[in-house]
Amino acid sequence: TLGFYDIMEDIMKLSINGIKNTTDWEKAGIKLPSYDVEKVAEDTKKSPVWVHFGIGNIFRIFIGGIADSLLEQGVSDKGITCVETFDFDVVDKIYKPFDNLVMAVTLKEDGNTEKKVLGSLTEAIKAQSYSQKEWKRLKEIFADPGLQMVSFTITEKGYALKDSKGEFFSFIREDIDNGPEKATSAMAVTAALLYERFKACKAPIAVVSMDNCSHNGEKLRNSITEMVTEWNKNGFVGNDFVDYVNNEELVSFPWSMIDKITPRPADSVAKALEEAGVEDMSPVITSKKTYIAPFVNAEGPQYLVIEDRFPNGRPQLEKAGVYMTDRQTVNKVERMKVTTCLNPLHTALAVYGCLLGYNLIADEMKDKELSELVRRIGLSEGMPVVINPEIISPQKFVDEVLNVRIPNPFMPDTPQRIATDTSQKVGIRYGETIKSYVAKDGSAKELIAIPLAIAGWCRYLLGIDDNGESFELSPDPMADELKKHLSGIKIGDISSYTGCLLYTSPS
């Protein structure tokens, strides 16, 4: 039993003890869970329903927020079991010291913030097959017939088994050769735990990628089934397990679309929380270079659209604002966002922001020309050919992007972050609209803003800003190759361009 002094010592600490002293938190304008956090954790440990792999910032505030909303409404009595596959420091430095609680900070465009403690993340486990304690616990969880879903935010790279030459990465090859009991990668760990479930109960389960990539469920399914097939070839698993994983009536891989801008934790937010009396809010940098804090700051708007294929039942996700629909509609929403309503605008601002010396995306919207550029990309050029998914209005979505989301001055999002890996994005973000115009009109000659965005990217690749000063390009796997193509171009000298950007198809 907690005594008076135990609670007083933990006043305004993000901990189970700390949030029991509700008065000070309320005075600071911070909402606390209305449900019994300890009971939810206890019940979830006994009967897990939802496991999540990849427990960083977007998971904590968005997916954790969904589970928190269901608990607040009383339509669920379970939280999420959190599993980290990559950066184990996150468990030791952010989850355990704060009793798995999250300080969720929503940054409103008017400068106000909404602050809420989330108690929906009930347990944090490291996906370490070499740790007997962690591995045993994970096996127990997956052996429970009541487990309904396992979801992922591990980034698109987390699903990749092979390199650009089509050969298995060395760490994946080791996972294939060593079998389920020595799994290390996210895909091998998941496949191994599905094998544990198969051996224990053969119960159905939904395996749901929530990463921001096209056809994410297909990517996840292909990687899991390939890992299982390789294990089968090596004699680690039988044909019956291969059949289990390949049967979507038993193991489904729903597609999804996720959208919520979640920048790295801002020092200004940490300072404001500490000034309000909350202790120990400083961000930390882990050994894997993850920049993370006890709090997560993010924008208010958020979208999660999921294909409704859950063979073992599911939480009532729609009660927390999740769009539950069919695969075709998920694909349409994703294409609407990626090819027209958000990502093409972001990329244009990213490359021009780097060239023009901006450090905040929102500040670019104060520039008349840049604001007009993205309005033309989204409205004048995008809307005539946009894919309409029906469940979300493209016009309302792009209006929110242009008038609320991008101009939000309190979102610490940078052009440099968004410019990362642009070579991997520019084709889908602009190419689909160009193709739509060619299909509609026979050519894309009437487009002005989209070609200007692509030209801006080529100019960005020269690595010289508008003042003639060198700057560092954001990380990009194609950067060196692209710079070679542009190596002869001199800024201000039109004659130095000799057609090096023209693509010649191999004969």
Feature annotation, model-predicted:
Residues S129-K133, L138-N239:
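Active-site periphery "cap/insert" segments of enzyme catalytic domains
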Residues I66-L107, E230-T262, N359-V385:
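Catalytic or ion-translocation cores adjacent to nucleophile or general acid/base/metal-coordination motifs
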Residues R221, T229-V237, V242-N331:
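Primary mode marks residue(s) on the alpha4-beta5-alpha5 output face of response regulator receiver
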Residues I11-E42:
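N-terminal regions that are enriched for targeting/export leaders
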Residues Y503-S507:
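Conserved small/polar residues in nucleotide/adenosyl-binding loops
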Residues Y352-P477, E481:
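C-terminal catalytic subdomain
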Residues K78-Q148, I154-Y159, D163:
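Glycine-rich nucleotide/cofactor/substrate-binding loop typically near the N-terminus or early
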Residues T286-P389:
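A conserved active-site cap/scaffold subdomain adjacent to cofactor or substrate pockets
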